[in-house]
From Swiss-Prot:
EC id: 2.7.7.48
Species this chain originates from: Rotavirus C (strain RVC/Pig/United States/Cowden/1980)
Annotated coiled-coil segments of the chain: none
Name of the protein: RNA-directed RNA polymerase
Subcellular location per the Swiss-Prot or TrEMBL entry: Virion
Catalytic activity: RNA(n) + a ribonucleoside 5'-triphosphate = RNA(n+1) + diphosphate
Entries under InterPro entries matching the protein: DNA/RNA_pol_sf, RNA-dir_pol_4-hel_dom, RNA-dir_pol_luteovirus, RNA-dir_pol_reovirus, Rotavirus_VP1_C
Record text on subunit structure and interactions: Interacts with VP3 (Potential). Interacts with VP2; this interaction activates VP1. Interacts with NSP5; this interaction is probably necessary for the formation of functional virus factories. Interacts with NSP2; this interaction is weak.
Length: 1082
């Protein structure tokens, strides 16, 4: 159903009382402006105006303005009665099915869902940290949205509506029993509200409603019911318990044909057949996991798992996958930091370890780091020489761990942000790159990371000097990892599908796939010291390779950062506590973990080689996980597999490393993805109504996040009710004007690509409306610019100016306006993460938007060329020739994708490469990288490459690029190639080819030659490229929307191409809450 229709129905559902009037606001093309002004004037002439009067005025307007020249932009609701009280609507559900709070054994008091006043003595002790849903929408609106969704479903699918109603009754009855948790203005749940209610009530209501919205059949109903009931009491281990058996089950599907990655990184089908085999250990692991489910009273899952275990069936595996996905939706486990790090602090030190293995492990780390950095040091890489500048340019606006008051030329600011501290320190001559100690006297403050189904992790918030010390080295290691297939997390040009084909490629009946979850890795205290020492040794060796004093300094402070952290103290409950483990928070965390992880698995495999004869076919590390495939000369037997598994485990324990090591023949499960029966699965575990942490986003931004998360889950096999999602969007984008007045933006605002875009009219498909009407609307919306006084004041202050000047002078030989503007913009953008600035901008933007939505006539248009103008122009000379039904064959590589998408993928093929959307493949970008630490953005490259040859020379010169290089660049007319390359990247960027489903489709598929027909003539390559890509996306969109493959032909003449080419140089990108959440670019 159309969004606007749905929103109107929903409003009637909410405002179900007499005294309410609705006023529709329209946007019209310029020629009908006076009619719209007339309409607005006539309905604003009195105090309170009757609905019938408004309706007659509206009818008058609609008869004057033809349909294609107007669109509904908002609804204004005047509700004078008592708001349709949610509590009253819930009363009919009674309290018969209400759940009762109960205490759990062996958990901390706050982890129990018991009455809040039994956890905290009084208001002074109370905190909402451990139950805060952290989202700007309320339990009331969630209930309202659910009741409306059920009432809508009754019209079309009574059977499923009954299921939803049954589940919702549990939630409603529980609310009736304890009372509705009411939030304050900032959507926080305070002591007064919570003291007589179960502590986790709000988070539980949200997660339960989220799970109810996912119910589509009996199976999902059963999963959801069990989780809803059990998560009321168990707030700690539920997700883990329910998803534990998965690890074994992935190994229990035979492979009958699969997709593999070839030598030259392409995907191809292989008809290989491999039977599954699991070891005794794994069967025991499984029975243990099942036993735990039984103890917890989770009979439904236990039965289902056991049945499937006895006779594994590829066709019902998606049902297992659903349980696995659902289990994450019970919400985040939020612990007190002192409990979260308890394990790490109390790790016992064991000297009874295999020193041989430790020595090898340590040497491997040292050699890897040495190998990675050797050339860079010998060639005196720019980024090492200017390590400090390089780090300052990419200094984030994250916390520096301490709150300071800073005076920016009269603008006082209290902030913890790194960038502000650096600017202030430089101005007051306090700035230094010396590494501050992190001992008892200066313990490290901790941040947190909450994940469903796992313990809370602590994050170090280190002083910015640590970032400066590590930045350059970490960046180089990352760059190296991008070229090494072993590092599957960083390996460039690859996506998840390639890494998957990589695994299936080597599987056969002679091979064992070992996979290890190393997530407790950080905690095992052995890791830290040996890791830091290996790093230091590698660094000392690197130091011998050069006499460059700058590089020596860089290496020295890097070594110092390692020495300091080796014996670090952290701040917990205002006490300094010694903490040995690697916590994240360092720049190098990710890459170092991967290097150590690779060294670990190589060491263990090396040890196994003394017991068996085998070939290591591949090793991969991906974050906390590692996996390897080893091929034996003979077929694998159950006995061999069991022996191998227990040996693998014993070698890990000889190093005193707490890991979960497993081996199978056909499947594996790691944190990011799991492979079973030669198919690829992802966990659809993104929470929608509970967030991990609070940020500066408004409810409007959060609506966009909600939609983006809904799409991610849907692409991973968990479909939520779209009605429910749209109603949530309707609630969260509404703007309260006064107590009685609320404004609801409509689809033409929410789904148009402007700064206000929230969702797509058709899921998985980005539509760029291209009528005259929408282009005018878009131009008007573009004129709504957010301003922030605080930001402007900071930018005017002497501190800010001198900092930008310092960066400029250090970076460029002679001031280049393009570069200095770029730096200024970047630095100013970093200020946006400072809450008061973000809020000021948002508020400013919303005030203007509110007046726009009520009366668009007073706004001036911004003359801006957007992608819509380009597509509108193209639409003038293309024809749809024919359309045929999309063939029913599905690509089953990812069985959980929606059906239409699987058919589309089967037709066009899977994409294996990401496209360059940053312009980094251009020669210009490469030359600058060679001589400077500055990385120009795509917009900047785009601007420079289109300037005169002299400007290009000047641009290069300001980065000290040798004259010889510049001459070569110009004489070989490289800039002409670059124009094309950069524009190409820019177009990819504009058409968001890395969005949602588009990133799965092979846009270079030969199939498109049959469906996009060009006229043969001498053409402008850029224009042709643009038309071609736009039409390819149009074809894909049509497949998804209508289930048809269309053939499109282009009928343009030479002037059209030239005109389009000129247009392309002025196209501007649009940023919105939608694009912020939906675009996946690394």
């Amino acid at each position: 159903m159309d969004y606007d229709t749905l929103a109107s129905k929903y409003l009637k559902f909410v405002y179900d009382f007499e005294d309410v009037t609705y006023q529709n606001n329209y946007f019209v093309t310029d020629e009908y402006k006076s009619d719209l002004e007339q309409y607005l004037k006539s309905i604003h002439d009195g105090e309170k105006i009757s609905q019938s009067k408004i309706d007659s005025m509206e009818t008058a307007l609609l008869t004057k303005v033809p349909k294609e020249k107007r669109c509904l932009i908002s609804k204004l609701v005047f509700a004078y009665g008592k708001h349709g009280n949610v509590e009253n609507k819930l009363l009919k559900y009674g309290t018969k099915d209400a759940l009762t709070h109960a205490i759990q054994k062996d958990v901390k008091p706050y982890e129990n869902n018991i009455i809040t006043s039994e956890i905290f003595k009084d208001e002074s002790e109370y905190t909402d940290t451990y139950m805060d849903p952290a989202i700007n929408t309320s339990c009331q609106s969630n209930c309202q949205a659910m009741m409306f969704t059920i009432s809508e479903m009754k019209l079309t699918d009574i059977k499923n509506a009954t299921r939803l109603e049954k589940l919702f009754t549990i939630v409603a009855a529980t609310i009736n029993k304890y009372g509705m948790p009411r939030h304050n203005i900032r959507y926080r749940y305070e002591w007064e509200t919570m003291k007589d209610k179960p502590y986790h009530l709000a988070a539980w209501i949200n997660s339960s409603i989220e799970m109810i919205a996912c119910v589509v059949d009996h199976h999902t109903y059963m999963i959801a019911r069990e989780l809803i009931v059990k998560s009321f009491t168990n707030r700690t281990s539920l997700a883990k318990l329910v998803s534990s058996p998965m690890t074994v089950l992935t190994a229990m599907l035979p492979i009958r044909g699969t997709v593999i990655t070839t030598e030259n990184l392409e995907l191809e089908y292989s008809s290989k057949s491999v039977n599954y085999l699991i070891s005794e250990e794994m069967a025991e692991d499984f029975m243990k996991a099942i036993e735990q489910l039984r103890d917890e009273g989770l009979e439904i899952y236990q039965d289902y798992y056991e049945k499937w275990f006895k006779s594994p069936d590829p066709l019902t595996f998606p049902n297992i996958a659903l349980i696995y996905s659902f289990s994450f939706h019970v919400g985040y486990r939020k612990q007190a930091l002192s409990d979260a790090v308890y394990d790490q602090i109390t790790v016992t030190y064991d000297d009874n370890v295999n020193m041989e293995m430790y020595k090898e492990y340590s040497e491997r780390i040292e050699n890897e780091i040495f190998t990675i950095l050797k050339d860079k040091v010998v060639h005196e890489d720019k980024r090492l020489e200017e390590y400090e500048l390089s780090a300052l340019l990419s200094m984030s606006s994250a916390s520096n761990g301490v709150l300071r008051e800073i005076d920016f030329g009269g603008q006082k600011v209290r902030s913890t942000k790194k960038n502000m501290h650096v600017i202030d320190d430089m101005y007051h001559k306090r700035y230094t790159t010396d590494i501050p100690p992190v001992d008892e006297r200066n313990p490290i403050p901790l941040g947190r990371r909450d994940v469903p189904g796992r313990r809370t992790r602590a994050i170090f918030i280190l002083p910015y000097q640590y970032f400066i010390a590590q930045h350059s080295f970490a960046e180089m290691m990352l760059k190296y990892a991008k070229r090494e297939r072993e590092y599957s997390e960083f390996y460039s040009q690859a996506n998840q599908v390639l890494s998957y084909g990589d695994v299936t490629r080597y599987l056969d009946s002679n091979s064992i796939l070992c996979f290890t979850d190393v997530s407790q890795w950080d905690a095992s205290q052995h890791n830290t010291r040996v890791l830091r020492r290996s790093i230091i040794r590698a660094m000392e060796r690197l130091k011998q390779l050069t006499h460059n004093t700058n590089i020596h300094k860089a290496i020295d402070i890097y070594i110092q950062s390692q020495k300091n952290l080796e014996n670090s103290y952290v701040l917990i409950d205002k006490k300094a506590i010694q903490y040995g483990a690697t916590a994240s928070g360092e720049k190098q965390t990710k890459i170092m973990n991967s290097i150590a992880n690779k060294a670990l698995i190589q060491t263990v495999l090396g040890k196994l080689m003394t017991d068996y004869t085998f070939d290591v076919k591949m090793i991969r590390v991906d974050g906390d996980d590692n996996y390897a495939i080893v091929r034996f000369p003979t077929a694998i037997t159950e006995k061999l597999l069991s022996e191998f598994t227990s040996k693998l485990r014993s070698y890990y324990s000889e190093m005193n490393v707490k890991v979960k090591a497993l081996a199978s023949l056909t499947g594996c499960e790691i944190a990011k993805r799991y492979i079973a029966g030669g198919m690829l699965f992802f966990r659809a575990g993104v929470n929608i109504l509970n967030h991990e942490k609070r940020n500066q986003d408004s409810a409007y931004d959060m609506a966009a996040t909600l939609y983006a998360n809904y799409i991610v889950n849907a692409l991973r096999g968990l479909t939520m009710s779209r009605t429910f999602i749209l109603v949530k969007i309707c609630q969260m984008t509404s703007i309260k004007i006064t107590g009685t007045l609320r404004l609801f933006p409509m689809k033409s605002i929410l789904a148009l690509n402007s700064t206000f875009k929230v969702f797509d009219e058709v899921d998985y498909v980005i539509n760029y409306p291209i009528s005259e009407l929408f282009i005018q609307l878009q131009r008007k919306l573009s004129s709504i610019k957010a301003k922030s006084k605080i930001a402007d004041n900071i930018a005017k202050s002497p501190q800010f100016k001198s900092y930008v000047e310092f960066l400029n002078k250090s970076l460029t030989a002679d001031e280049n306006p393009i570069v200095s503007d770029g730096i200024k913009l970047t630095e100013k953008a970093k200020l946006n993460s400072y809450a008061p600035i973000a809020l000021e901008k948002r508020r400013d933007q919303f005030n203007m938007m509110v007046s726009f939505l009520q009366n668009p006539t007073t706004f001036k248009s911004e003359t801006v060329v957007t992608i819509n103008d380009v597509l509108y122009f193209i639409s003038g000379f293309i024809k749809i020739n024919s359309s045929v039904a999309l063939p029913k064959e599905e690509n089953n590589t990812m069985p959980l994708l929606p059906v239409t998408i699987k058919r589309t993928l089967n037709y066009f093929g899977l994409r294996t490469h990401d496209y360059d959307i940053k312009g980094s493949s251009s020669t210009m970008s490469k030359i600058i990288k060679q001589y400077s630490v500055y990385t120009p953005g795509i917009e900047e490259l785009y601007e420079v490459v289109n300037k005169s040859i002299d400007s290009i020379r000047g641009y290069f010169a300001s980065f000290n690029v040798p004259k010889a290089d510049v001459d070569t660049y110009i004489s070989t007319q490289m800039y002409k190639h670059d124009r094309f390359k950069i524009l190409q990247a820019y177009i990819y960027n504009l058409l968001s080819v890395n969005y949602g489903m588009y990133q799965l489709v092979d846009l270079n598929s030969a199939k498109f030659f049959d469906h996009v027909i060009h006229t043969p003539m001498a053409k402008t390559p850029t224009a042709v490229f643009m038309i071609d890509l736009a039409l390819r996306l149009k074809v894909i969109n049509h497949c998804i929307e209508k289930g048809e493959v269309i053939t499109v032909s282009v009928h343009a003449n030479k002037t059209d191409y030239l005109k389009l080419w000129r247009m392309l140089w002025n196209v501007k990108t649009m940023n919105s809450p939608y694009s912020k959440n939906s675009m996946f670019d690394e």
